[in-house]
């Protein structure tokens, strides 16, 4: 019987191969063992702020690091075209069953994506720009695949915003984007993982 996976395992990831291996074994229980048990709220917050800032031009939408489709579920009522992209085929198989997405894309976000320039009207992402997962350089590729004026609604782990260079990256691309709005949100609700309740 395998040990239950958790936030500590996710934060220990070092390479894309680590991600593939972790989520291969975690996919079938991710929603119950992690999201439900920890009252994982980031996808809900993404949905809330997407509704706040979006307009009819923000389509199609790309859910970056979509995993099992938790963000897609929060956007599903928007009736807009949403595609999911993730490195884990097993996680994407769970997302596919939720019928939230028009297209499922298996890809490594640290490499050039097989997506045309200026295709998407919005990017959403929860829990991807965090320890061991995806760093700030991925923003360049996401800018390539989005239209001018595209809406980005992302969570970035607060401990990494400066440490991993997200602040410098955003400063470096500021001529290509509108002034960002920052909101501090709770990642977890009332029952978080005991080691990461303050994330």
Regions found by a protein language model. Give the residues of each.
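Conserved beta-strand signature within the Rossmann-like core of class I S-adenosyl-L-methionine
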Residues: 149-157
